[in-house]
Each structure stands twice: as C-alpha cells, then as structure tokens.
Amino acid sequence: GFIIMKYIDEQTQAQLLNMNEVILEVEKALQAFSENKTITPLRYVLPFNEQNRYLVMPALSDELNIVGLKTVSFAPENSKKGKATITGSVILSDYETGETLSILDGGFLTKVRTGAISGVATKYLAKENAKTLSVIGAGVQAEGLIEAILAVRDIEKIHIASRTFEKAENFAQNIRNRFNIKVSVFRSADEAIDSADIVVTATNANQPVYTHSLHPGVHLNAVGSFKPDMQEIPSETMLVANKIVVESMEAALEETGDLKIPQAEGILTKNMLHSELGDIISGEKVGRETEEEVTVFKSVGLAIVDIIVAQYFYKKLIQS
C-alpha cells in the first residue's frame, strides 16, 4: 500500500505522550547503542550566520529496525526576538523500504527524549527513596526532565533556581499546576541543591552554575553544556563522584565541556568514567550500590534515542 507521510507537530506529540512508555523505549535504544547494535555517528556541527549552528545526526539500528535523521538549529540571538533558540526536526524512514514515514517537530521531541534519558539514568542511579529534586535552569528542557524523574521516583518536593528569579517563579507555578507538587524557588543554585537527593542542571551556562560540593547519596543529571567550551558543573564534582555515567563514551569526551574541561585540567581521565548508561540497563555494569555514593550522569543526547522516540510517536498516531 501507499505510505502517506505524516507531519507530527508539538501538540499532537503532547497528546500522544505517555512518559512511562517512552522511558522503556529509550532504555531499549540506549542498550542497543552500548551493545554496538546501532550506527550512530558523532554529530556534524555546521556553523552559519556567525553564532548559529546546524547539527545533523543520522542514526539507525538493525536490532531495533529503525532508521532516521535528526537536525537541530541553534540560534542564540532568537531569544531577543521572542523565538526559540533551538529548533529542529526528526525524519523517520521505513526500515524495509527507506520511504519517509514521518517528519516530527524536533523541539518537543527533544524535550521528551532529554527528559526520558535522564529519567532512565535516575531510575538506575538515584537512591530508591529520593524525595527532593533540585532543578537548576527553568528553560524548555527542565519541564521534560521533571516529568521523567517524577515517573521513576516518588518525589515530594522540587527546588528551582535560575539566573532570572522571575523566570524561576513563573516556571515553578507552571510545574505546581501541571504536577500538583510542592515547588520552592531559590535565589542561589547552591541553596537549591543543598538538601536535594537528585539534582538536574539544564542551563545554557558557559561557567559552572553551583560551587558547593555534592552531598553523599546525591545523583546529578547534568544536561546543559552541549558544546566543548561550555561548562555547567564545577570540575571538582568529578572528583567527588563515585560513578560518572554517560550515554556514549566516544561522544561525551568529544562534545561537552563538562568532561573536556576537567580532562584538560588533569582532573578527569577517561578511565574515571564508570560506564555507558546502556551497560547498566543490560546488567553488564552496576548502577547505584550504596546510599552514600555520589553518582553523576552527563547527558549530551544520542540520535538513536531521538529516532526511537519518533517511532514511538508515529506508532501511537497510527494506532489512534
């Protein structure tokens, strides 16, 4: 039969989304990646119009029967025009024929997969009884991260800190309304993380956003700093961490200043990285072992995950 190519916009994705289902799909993709059952090249970054970046990320898997392409445009000046700084799309192709099945709005999908990846990390690395979640950053990614972490742990209260207090206040109200949970806003990131069991940093910062040492038992999801010169978490955190986990050993050391900068400073070596997240999912490596451990998950995204999330939305749309 004929394939009718579908465009799946943000609104449709939001209606189709069940975060618990997405988390399970994302686990499959992360595991397949770590078992070398995907082809996920390092992303291409093409500069244009001075500060803008065009990122191109193909990925496929014979194991998962998926093939697709993600594109992202990063345009920092857009915020001044009231436009999104990050836009993009995911193209999902048919594994048998290569025909284009669907083009999906990449903004919402990125928010979902970013959240889901850290949700998976939190599931395996945070304390079972974690109650307090601290989020540094009140941007687009933060909401997806909160939704995914609430799916894997019984969080009772959320702390928010952001560069702009007003933005943090507005974001907090949005989170209260949406998830019916207690949310407190802090002026300083250090105060926000001091009593937290789980910390998420999701900012566009070039410099570390907190200075305090992480307490025993904390799990950190570091999600910002997607460029080699961006550092969101202090180098010292790498020394405190008992386990540092990444999506891709290869990509992590290439793509983020959170690892590149401490590496250049001689603080972090490659053998200090505990494992890829996929190896913990498969049981090849262990996750959290004690209540006292400090665990760090550094996320830069992985195109095979975007493609599996695209497939999830496409399948749900076809079913409905």
Positions of the model-derived regions?
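N-terminal ligand-binding/catalytic initiation module
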Residues: I4-K111, G119, N129, S275, ...
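Adenosine-phosphate binding glycine-rich loop
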Residues: Q11, D229-S320
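Short helix-loop-beta connector
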Residues: A126-T132, D154, H215-P216
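Conserved beta-strand elements of the Class I
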Residues: L133-S134, T295
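Glycine-rich Rossmann-fold phosphate-binding loop(s) that bind the pyrophosphate
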Residues: A138-G139
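N-terminal Rossmann-fold NAD(P) dinucleotide-binding loop
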Residues: A142-E143
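NAD(P)-binding Rossmann-fold cofactor-contacting core
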Residues: V152-R178
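Rossmann-like adenosine-cofactor binding region
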Residues: I181-P262, I267
